[in-house]
Amino acid sequence: MSKQSQFVCHRIKQDGPEPGEKPAGPMVEWVVRRIRARGAPPLDEILGPDAVLVPLPRSAPFPPNQKNVLWVPNRIAQALVAEGWGHTVEPMLARATLVQKSAFAESGQRPGPQAHLDSMTVTRGLTAPERIVLIDDVVTKGATLLAGASLIRGVFPGIQVDCFALVRTLGLQPEVDRIVDPVVGTIARNPWGGADRRP
């Protein structure tokens, strides 16, 4: 597996510190700024100043009355809004019950879309947004994103729902050509109840 991409992914999931800067700032903000500065036309199809960004919940419910819990998708959403790639951040999705972390699950044992559907709740705001973009830190198969989109569409029928992940896995490739390589693809439920991501 690519050492460089592993390093970047780990830094993103811990949100810091950014490389090469003294004092170091948050990694998420650094990555989003870098993508924005380089230009990423594919992302302009998904993100924009009219989009309401909804961060995906963690694998476990937030501890009651505990503040400052690391929630990377929310930090990504805030960084995207700061760069003009979103209108506002609305945490509509919450985790009601624990699911296994995909990062620690064996291949074939990751929670599927239905497990995520059963473990999440959605809260409707006062007004219906015109379009929503779900935000995640890392996408593997896309089961969590697929479940989140289903829940949002159940509350807001007919609304446009897109998804964005800062990192997409590429399997066991020995090395990657580019760390920054935005693409637009699809995530769909397969006949076996799982999620398929292309590319």
What are these regions (language model features)?
Residues 1-52, 59-70, 93-129:
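Active-site-facing substrate-recognition patch
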Residues 146-199:
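PRPP-dependent phosphoribosyltransferase catalytic core
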Residues 69-77, 83:
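C-terminal substrate/ligand-recognition segments
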Residues 87, 132, 159-161:
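Hydrophobic anchor at the start of a short beta-strand
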Residues 134-148:
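A phosphate-binding catalytic loop at a beta-strand-loop-alpha-helix junction
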Residues 52, 133, 162-164:
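A structural signal for isolated positions on well-ordered beta-strands in alpha/beta enzyme cores
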Residues 3, 84, 88, 123, ...:
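Catalytic phosphate/metal-binding cores of nucleic-acid and nucleotide-processing enzymes, i.e., regions
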Residues 55-57, 136, 165-167:
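Short beta-strand/turn micro-motifs composed of small residues
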